[in-house]
Curated annotation (Swiss-Prot):
Cell membrane among keywords: no
PROSITE patterns: TIM_1, TIM_2
Isomerase is among the record's keywords: yes
Taxonomic lineage: Bacteria, Bacillati, Actinomycetota, Actinomycetes, Kitasatosporales
Key words of the record: Cytoplasm, Gluconeogenesis, Glycolysis, Isomerase
Residues at which substrate binds: 11-13, 179, 219, 240-241
Protein name: Triosephosphate isomerase
Pathway(s) per entry: Carbohydrate biosynthesis; gluconeogenesis; Carbohydrate degradation; glycolysis; D-glyceraldehyde 3-phosphate from glycerone phosphate: step 1/1
Protein's job: Involved in the gluconeogenesis. Catalyzes stereospecifically the conversion of dihydroxyacetone phosphate (DHAP) to D-glyceraldehyde-3-phosphate (G3P).
Main location: cytoplasm
Top-level taxonomic group: Bacteria
EC supergroup of this enzyme: isomerase
Length: 258
């Protein structure tokens, strides 16, 4: 069995200006400095306007915190007003980029085709995509959550070579659990994450599937993270609201101490 380093990532969404971002990352770095946290990878997904500040801080202080963006254009450049390209994110030395977050799918009509194009754009420029998938409440209530989520995984990874797919991070985020305080039960999250790994084995190989990190996201807090992280197919958390409170996020990162 492959060991997968847990990835604990904070998705700040549209919060924290660049000055607040600096203060926040400094607090995280300080709180995480007293112990060696190599066993867990920590990342923040910041608004575009914060990335340069975060980069300067991380580079300057040689912080172990990784950072990335919350979206990427499918295009490399040109007349796409308001968009941010892969080359721009690569220049800022981003490690990660979230692709297909449910808020992008919902408010910006991102289809699996668009998400797939963005996943490819991320790889083209050396960024690791965090492919976000997950069902709405009506889909879960109808019992179609696994099928729905696996279709998003397949659509997002379409035509992607194994050399690329093996480094993808997949975030299972049931839409009804995002920002609602309704956490998906650990067993329910495990069911879908195991199914995602099964789909990767079917699309590529069991060996590749065993390497891919699958995160859970949706109302993760310090109080529920340990139970979620104890599940065999859950390799990290994508944390929204609770990642804006540095003390709380540090507790989430240190779930093993609980
Ligand atoms: O969407 C999420 C992370 O990407 C989850 O958000 P919350 O943790 O606020 O529910």
């Amino acid at each position: 069995m492959t060991t997968r380093t847990p990835l604990m990532a904070g998705n700040w969404k549209m919060n924290l200006n660049h000055l607040e971002a600096i203060a926040h990352v400094q607090k995280l770095a300080f709180a995480l400095a007293d112990k060696d946290y190599d066993a867990v990878e920590v990342a923040v997904l910041a608004p575009f306007t914060d990335l340069r500040s975060v980069q300067t801080l991380v580079d300057g202080d040689k912080l172990k915190i990784k950072y990335g963006a919350q979206d990427i254009s499918a295009h490399d450049g040109g007349a796409y007003t308001g968009e941010i390209s892969g080359p721009m994110l690569a220049k800022l030395k981003c490690t990660y980029v979230a692709v297909g977050h449910s808020e992008r799918r919902q408010y910006h009509a991102e289809t699996d085709e668009i998400v797939n194009a963005k996943v490819k754009a991320a790889y083209k420029h050396g960024l690791t995509p965090i492919l976000c998938v997950g069902e709405e409440l009506d889909v879960r209530e109808a019992g179609n959550h696994v099928e729905h989520t696996l279709a998003q995984v397949e659509g997002g990874l379409k035509d992607l070579a194994a050399e690329q797919a093996e480094s993808v991070v997949i975030a299972y985020e049931p839409v009804w659990a995002i920002g609602t305080g309704k956490v998906c039960g650990a067993d329910d999250a495990q069911e879908v994450c195991a199914a995602i790994r099964g789909k990767l084995a079917e699309l590529y190989s069991q060996e590749l599937a065993d390497k891919v990190r699958i995160q859970y996201g949706g109302s993760v807090k310090s109080g529920n993270v340990a139970e979620i992280m104890a599940k065999p197919d859950i390799d990290g958390a994508l944390v929204g609201g609770a990642s804006l409170d540095s003390d709380e996020f540090v507790k989430i990162v240190r779930f093993r101490d609980q």
